[in-house]
C-alpha cells in the first residue's frame, strides 16, 4: 500500500520531463560506470517494444520509483528502480504486483 503522499501513474509513452526524472533516479541508484545520459536513455528505450512504464510520484512532483515492462528478443522483461531513500518500504513489491496483474511470465533486468 502506498502512502497518501504518493501515486502511481502508468503510461506507454514518457514525456521529456519524465525521461529526465528517470535518468536522474537511474544515475542516483546505479554505480557511476552504469550512468546514463538522456540520449543513451532514449536509445535504451528505442531498443525495446511494447513498453509500459509505472512511475511512483511523491507529493505530486518527485519521482521515487520506476518500473518498466518491455519485449526484447521475444521475451517479456521488467526492471524496477526505487530511490534509496524509499527502499525497504514495500514500493518495489507494490510495483511488481501491478506488473504481475497483466503478465504471467517475466524476466528481470538488473
Residue ranges and their predicted role:
Residues 1-39:
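Short amphipathic alpha-helix that is part of the acyltransferase structural core
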Residues 2, 47-50, 100-102:
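Flexible, charged surface loops at secondary-structure boundaries
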Residues 17, 77, 90:
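Residues that form or flank phosphate/diphosphate-binding pockets in enzymes
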Residues 31-54, 58:
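Active-site rim helix/loop that mediates acceptor-substrate recognition in acyltransferases
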Residues 56, 61-71, 76-81:
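Conserved beta-strand in the GNAT
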Residues 79-88, 110:
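A short, internal acetyl-CoA/4′-phosphopantetheine-binding micro-motif in the GNAT/acyltransferase core
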Residues 88-101:
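Conserved acetyl-CoA-binding loop-helix of GNAT-fold acetyltransferases
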Residues 101-110:
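Conserved GNAT acetyl-CoA-binding A-motif
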Amino acid at each position: 500500500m502506498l502512502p497518501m503522499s504518493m501515486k502511481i501513474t502508468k503510461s506507454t509513452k514518457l514525456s521529456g520531463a519524465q525521461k529526465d526524472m528517470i535518468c536522474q533516479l537511474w544515475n542516483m541508484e546505479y554505480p557511476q560506470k552504469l550512468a546514463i545520459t538522456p540520449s543513451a536513455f532514449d536509445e535504451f528505450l528505442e531498443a525495446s517494444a511494447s513498453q509500459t512504464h509505472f512511475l511512483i510520484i511523491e507529493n505530486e512532483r518527485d519521482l521515487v520509483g520506476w518500473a518498466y515492462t518491455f519485449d526484447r528478443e521475444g521475451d517479456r522483461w521488467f526492471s524496477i528502480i526505487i530511490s534509496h531513500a524509499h527502499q525497504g518500504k514495500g514500493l518495489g513489491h507494490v510495483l511488481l504486483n501491478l506488473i504481475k496483474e497483466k503478465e504471467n511470465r517475466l524476466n528481470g533486468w538488473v
